């Protein structure tokens, strides 16, 4: 804190009267403010920011942070411009414009055979991370426990802690990353308030099958435990598989906040627009928090997306990203890295423990080595564990142009 000027208008430090040579004189001393106790003392710069900065520093192809390097559909941009020119530039309703919520309800009913009421059960949010924070704020009280599955997207734990909750870590068993339901059951306590799931899963690119959804149903039956389901990659499920949305399962949907992302679906991550589905009673609590966290969301984006949804392009996303996945893997399948299956999302992971020259290297160091020496940035999967569990695995994003993927692949072939 800067030294405070010594006059009555600008001196905000304490005034201390001293007696100097028997005369009373007032001097203004700067007394440093105590550093506040951090609510997140162990949280620093995210690995995504760090690796993207490193990629820029060394000129590496950035397959680390999950965003496309190609443009969205020009029709969506045109619809955004039309919305702004039509005067949709002031506050929309707190829950989002009704036409967009109606389009979401129609999509969900078509895909998952579950009817959400647009007025009272669908809320537009400023990205999926805000939706996650709002859902947790709505239901978590100090001391409540929230079970999350590791490896886990890095925002879950901090947001639980910011709300006074206690994260409880279940493990997706390496290398298949399937839940151990016996372990999950053992973690449930009288303080368990919610369970958070993510399918398709970031970072492992796995998708929960019907078997696991039924196991989750059985686990939660006859409990008052809430469910937060992060389904932002719902349209990126490959090889003919179906996305097992919580909305398909009435016994789960009745206790669930389901979150999805237009940014992911329409290649506009910078627009930060998503939505939350929940039964009316849960939505009421969600909106109580939502109105004071963000109040509402960018108006022209909502009108643009509402009109764009009618085109049905989300139905093409599975084929679009499966082609990207197959293109990339076809160019790296003969590399020394061992590539893990990618069943969904726009990520794929690779293992290197079998490589004698790298086996002793922590995955954080290996990721930095790939960026500095070979010119490809990725994300170490240990960053998705609270205790930095290291399975010698790194994650790559293939939401890129074919030219970008081909260049990255040619560099990885030299590892």
Question: Model-found features: residue ranges?
Answer:
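PLP-dependent enzyme catalytic core of the Aspartate aminotransferase-like
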Residues: 25-32, 106, 185-186, 359-360, ...
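N-terminal small-domain helix-loop-helix segment of the aminotransferase-like
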Residues: 34-127, 134, 308-311
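Conserved PLP-anchoring active-site segment centered on the Schiff-base-forming lysine
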Residues: 138-160
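A short helix-loop-beta submotif of the ANL/AMP-binding
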Residues: 162-168
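A short helix->loop->beta-strand "cap" motif at the edges of active sites that frequently abuts
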Residues: 165, 222-225, 253-254
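Active-site phosphate-binding strand-loop segment of PLP-dependent enzymes
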Residues: 172-239
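PLP-dependent aminotransferase class I/II
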Residues: 255-344
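Conserved PLP-binding catalytic core of the aspartate aminotransferase-like
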Residues: 321-322, 335-373
């Amino acid at each position: 804190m800067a030294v405070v000027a010594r006059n009555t208008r600008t001196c905000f430090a304490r005034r201390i009267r001293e007696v100097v040579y028997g005369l009373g004189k007032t001097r203004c001393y700067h007394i440093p403010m105590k550093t506040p106790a951090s609510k997140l003392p162990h949280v620093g710069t995210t690995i995504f920011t760090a690796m993207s900065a490193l990629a820029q520093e060394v000129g590496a192809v950035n397959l680390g942070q999950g965003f496309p390097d190609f443009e969205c559909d020009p029709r969506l941009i045109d619809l955004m411009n039309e919305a702004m020119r039509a005067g949709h530039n002031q506050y929309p309703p707190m829950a989002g414009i009704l036409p967009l919520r109606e389009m979401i309800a129609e999509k969900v009913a078509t895909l998952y055979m579950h009817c959400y009421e647009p007025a009272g059960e669908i809320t537009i949010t400023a990205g999926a991370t805000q939706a996650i924070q709002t859902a947790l704020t709505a239901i978590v009280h100090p001391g409540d426990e929230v079970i999350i599955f590791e490896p886990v997207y890095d925002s879950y734990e901090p947001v639980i802690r910011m709300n006074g909750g206690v994260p409880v870590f279940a493990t997706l068993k390496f290398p298949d990353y399937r839940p151990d339901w016996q372990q999950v059951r053992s973690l449930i306590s009288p303080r368990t308030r919610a369970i958070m799931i993510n399918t398709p899963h970031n970072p492992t690119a796995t998708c929960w099958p019907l078997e696991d959804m039924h196991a989750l149903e059985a686990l939660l039956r006859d409990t008052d435990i809430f469910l937060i389901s992060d389904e932002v990659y719902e349209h990126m499920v490959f090889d003919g598989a179906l996305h097992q949305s919580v909305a398909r399962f009435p016994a789960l949907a009745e206790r669930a906040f389901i979150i999805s992302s237009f940014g992911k679906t329409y290649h506009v991550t910078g627009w930060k627009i998503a939505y939350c589905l929940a039964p009316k009673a849960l939505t009421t609590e969600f909106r109580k928090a939502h109105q004071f966290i963000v109040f509402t969301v960018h108006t022209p984006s909502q009108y643009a997306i509402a009109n764009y949804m009618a085109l049905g392009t989300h139905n093409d996303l599975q084929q679009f990203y499966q082609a990207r996945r197959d293109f990339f893997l076809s160019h790296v399948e003969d590399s020394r890295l061992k590539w893990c299956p990618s069943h969904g999302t726009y990520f794929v992971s690779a293992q290197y423990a079998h490589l004698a020259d790298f086996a002793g290297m922590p995955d954080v160091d290996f990721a930095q080595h790939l960026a500095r020496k070979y010119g490809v940035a990725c994300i170490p999967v240990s960053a998705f564990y609270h205790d930095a569990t290291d399975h010698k695995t790194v994650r790559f994003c293939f939401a890129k142009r074919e030219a970008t993927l081909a260049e990255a692949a040619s560099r990885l072939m030299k590892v």
